[in-house]
């Protein structure tokens, strides 16, 4: 998996603050300087004022201003299972690598056993891995080796069958039906800062599946560089709380 910040609103926290101050200003924020807009906010410098205002907004549940700052992420190599989970979220725009127009006829099926094309879950590589809804708390070495081999055999066979169907003239849009839900996909997705916090509330939580949790954590790391005061406050004061931010 690889996650990159593809594009994002410049000076996002200036924009958040301008939008928030607009609600309480008798002068349009479009006709005055940022310094004038922030004049009544506590702080000795503009950076302190931004920190004060952003903390106040998040602490009091005034999330609307955070919808003005937008970020676009490029995600490479997550499973179709992870894609199905993240695309359930509203107010996020997606473009997804197509399996109708992109075929995988040149992939070596044996390489699939080692992570090519199909995501390998930790439970197929780590005998001590404990996952949600697992039927057995622990497994023997023999059981682990057997399940790891079954997993690798199955995905290798699926890719071989897919490629055979292509060779027999089946269109990629139909041949893809035999590929596993772990097949890797690339995604471009855009969301505002408020929505990213909501996604993190749901998908960085301990009860989220390991893959989408890892993806979300990487997005949060990138967001911390892009929108630092907002996501520092989120990490310290909001992340993991029971009252999750509504979409």
Curated annotation (Swiss-Prot):
It catalyses: dUMP + (6R)-5,10-methylene-5,6,7,8-tetrahydrofolate + NADPH + H(+) = dTMP + (6S)-5,6,7,8-tetrahydrofolate + NADP(+). Keywords: FAD, Flavoprotein, Methyltransferase, NADP, Nucleotide biosynthesis, Transferase. Its cofactor is FAD. Binds 4 FAD per tetramer. Each FAD binding site is formed by three monomers. Transmembrane segments: none annotated. It holds the Pfam family Thy1. The active site is at residue 203. GO terms for biological process: dTMP biosynthetic process; dTTP biosynthetic process; methylation. The keyword Flavoprotein applies. PANTHER family: FLAVIN-DEPENDENT THYMIDYLATE SYNTHASE. NCBIfam families: thyX. Catalyzes the reductive methylation of 2'-deoxyuridine-5'-monophosphate (dUMP) to 2'-deoxythymidine-5'-monophosphate (dTMP) while utilizing 5,10-methylenetetrahydrofolate (mTHF) as the methyl donor, and NADPH and FADH(2) as the reductant. This is Flavin-dependent thymidylate synthase. It comes from Haloarcula marismortui (strain ATCC 43049 / DSM 3752 / JCM 8966 / VKM B-1809).
